[in-house]
């Protein structure tokens, strides 16, 4: 059966007409835009034939907005109205931003929902608005170079961006007038670029160290399928941090501290130039105000060594998650301008025991991979056999009785994905159920991260355990989570889209994973105890309900024995002895065996009253 293609009026391309689509690397330090022309990927250059557009926005007089190199030139002159590295702020709360980056030169205000607004000469602007200005610049550049309107764009984001950060990126694109075909993880985009160019199969590590973020992905390439086995990284680690370490070193060596935001910016710019010069030189001279000195590559290596080590710890964890060893990695792809630092390449090579791949410019590889994906999604490669599988970083689950976590989608599950599970009511006549969505690897809700709650109402009153509620978790290709709960007999349902106001750092994810391993035995013991307590409460509720209806079926001695077993089990379920609670449940079950049989006989007699054998 043929597919029917539907498009908005005026947007339908003529048969075999090449549709204009771009891949955008919206970077912390620099951004790029790329496309596919005549089956070749290429970076689109600006009017001065430069591939990079600095991710810098200046807000000037008369609402004049400048983006890129020109904005960068104004950064040291007018730092409070020049926004740099806005990617670090997007999707975060003001409280989070101020805690992470206390030395930013901006004046912040809080929006109604607690998100940061940057006070500028123009007005108070959000990180989404600032990002949209960068995207507008890239869009205009692409239209000028391609000579037409864009059908869509694939925009890359760090693998550890959470729902709020991804949604904010989409919002920025919408403000810029872009049709987002898909958000794509940066390491995955790099894998696409290298996978198509080399066609190699096997395990690949993508080491992506940019200006402000670090990502490590372990992928398997097999028969055209890119599968992300595991991801890791740090949303607050990059070349910017190298610059600040050098700036701090200069301050310490010279004894000269910057006196204002302008001097701070000039010092960081000097540190950046020194870092770049040390890529090709063993020693570089420094002139800072009236101080003259020099810095060697070895001194620079010592400064950045703790940060490089931090990135390699993430690599080790990702390999463990992927269940592969460094020896099994066939290729190591280097991505991001900061991977030009010789010490970084050397340390990564030693860790993976092989020479890293740098055949594609590390600054350009992500944008080129995004362009390939955009070309496919817009329909220029309908017969492409390439399949792309991303993963979620932490398990998604639901709270059940007793504060237990039932995992619906385990971590490192490929996305998009949908999983459903059925739950039931705990009490007789229960007409509502609260769905508590949690994230993490621990067994108890108290040890996991709460994402959201919503309530399903309108459940028909039934006996405990009779209602059937189907809970569905859906994670789309952009990593956004939708949860729906539906009562099956009535079809009544409720749903929610999870958009946390701010997300987890890699350190927090690391702590959550480490805690789950360190506390594995205690967690299992706690879960077994909680499960027995829940079962004890269920049995007690059930017996009390039965006694309220059919106490007359028991003599005094039998009633006394059941009550004694009830009291004993109630005491036990408040203690911490799992085996004792289990035995208490067995004792109550034994005490109520005859009672249960009599109730069954009574129900059968009631059902048969007024009916003949022929009726049955």
Curated annotation (Swiss-Prot):
PROSITE patterns listed in its UniProt record: HSP70_1 (PS00297), HSP70_2 (PS00329), HSP70_3 (PS01036)
Keywords: ATP-binding, Chaperone, Nucleotide-binding
Entry keyword Chaperone: yes
Recorded GO MF terms: ATP binding; ATP hydrolysis activity; ATP-dependent protein folding chaperone; unfolded protein binding
Biological processes, Gene Ontology terms: iron-sulfur cluster assembly
Annotated family: Belongs to the heat shock protein 70 family.
Chain's role: Chaperone involved in the maturation of iron-sulfur cluster-containing proteins. Has a low intrinsic ATPase activity which is markedly stimulated by HscB.
Name of the protein: Chaperone protein HscA homolog
Protein's organism: Mannheimia succiniciproducens (strain KCTC 0769BP / MBEL55E)
């Amino acid at each position: 059966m043929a597919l029917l293609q539907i498009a908005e009026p005026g947007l339908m391309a003529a048969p075999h007409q090449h549709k204009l689509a771009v891949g955008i690397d919206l970077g912390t330090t620099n951004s790029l835009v790329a496309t596919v022309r005549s089956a070749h990927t290429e970076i689109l250059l600006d009017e001065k034939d430069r591939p990079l557009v600095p991710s810098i926005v200046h807000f000037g007089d008369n609402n004049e907005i400048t983006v890129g190199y020109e904005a960068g030139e104004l950064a040291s002159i007018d730092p409070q109205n020049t926004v740099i590295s806005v990617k670090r702020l997007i999707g975060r709360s003001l409280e989070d931003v101020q805690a992470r980056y206390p030395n930013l030169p901006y004046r912040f205000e809080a929006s109604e929902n607690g998100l940061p607004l940057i006070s500028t000469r123009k007005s108070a602007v959000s990180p989404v608005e600032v990002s949209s200005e960068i995207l507008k610049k890239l869009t205009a550049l692409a239209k000028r170079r391609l000579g037409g309107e864009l059908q869509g764009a694939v925009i890359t984001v760090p693998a550890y961006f959470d729902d709020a950060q991804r949604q904010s990126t989409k919002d920025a694109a919408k403000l810029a007038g872009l049709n987002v075909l898909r958000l794509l993880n940066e390491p995955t985009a790099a894998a696409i670029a290298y996978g198509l160019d080399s066609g190699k199969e096997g395990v690949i590590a993508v080491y992506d160290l940019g200006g402000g973020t670090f990502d490590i992905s372990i992928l398997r390439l097999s028969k055209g399928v890119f599968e992300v086995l595991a991801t890791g990284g740090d949303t607050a680690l990059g070349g910017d941090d190298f610059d600040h370490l050098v700036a701090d070193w200069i301050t310490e060596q010279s004894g000269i501290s910057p006196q204002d935001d302008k001097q701070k910016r000039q010092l960081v710019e000097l540190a950046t130039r020194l870092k770049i010069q040390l890529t090709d030189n063993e020693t570089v001279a420094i002139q800072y105000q009236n101080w003259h000195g020099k810095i060697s590559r070895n001194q620079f290596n010592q400064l950045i060594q703790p940060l490089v080590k931090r990135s390699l710890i993430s690599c080790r964890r990702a390999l463990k998650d992927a269940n592969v060893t460094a020896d099994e990695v066939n290729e190591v792809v280097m991505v991001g301008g900061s991977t030009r630092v010789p010490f970084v390449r050397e340390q990564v090579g030693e860790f993976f025991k092989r020479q890293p791949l740098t055949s594609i410019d590390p600054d350009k590889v992500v944008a080129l991979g995004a362009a390939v994906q955009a070309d496919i999604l817009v329909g220029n490669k309908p017969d492409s056999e390439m399949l792309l599988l991303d993963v979620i970083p932490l398990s998604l689950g639901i709270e059940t009785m007793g504060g237990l976590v039932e995992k619906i989608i385990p971590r490192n599950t490929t996305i998009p994905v949908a999983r459903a599970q059925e739950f039931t009511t705990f009490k007789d006549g229960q007409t509502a159920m609260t769905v508590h969505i949690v994230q993490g690897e621990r067994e108890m809700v108290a040890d996991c991260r709460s994402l959201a709650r919503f309530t399903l109402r309108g459940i028909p009153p039934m006996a405990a355990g009779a209602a059937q509620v189907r809970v569905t978790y859906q994670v789309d290709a952009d990593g956004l989570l939708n949860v729906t709960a539906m009562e099956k007999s009535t079809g009544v349902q409720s749903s929610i889209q999870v958009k946390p106001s701010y997300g987890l750092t890699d350190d927090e994810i690391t702590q959550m994973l480490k805690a789950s391993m360190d506390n594995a035995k205690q967690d299992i013991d706690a879960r077994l105890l909680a499960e027995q307590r829940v079962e004890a409460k269920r049995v007690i509720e059930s017996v009390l309900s039965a006694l309220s209806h059919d106490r007359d079926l028991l003599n005094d001695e039998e009633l006394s024995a059941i009550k004694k077993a009830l009291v004993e089990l109630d005491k036990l379920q408040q203690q911490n002895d799992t085996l004792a609670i289990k035995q208490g449940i067995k004792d109550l079950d034994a005490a109520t065996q005859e009672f249960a049989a009599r109730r069954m006989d009574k129900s059968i007699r009631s059902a048969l009253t007024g009916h003949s054998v022929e009726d049955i």
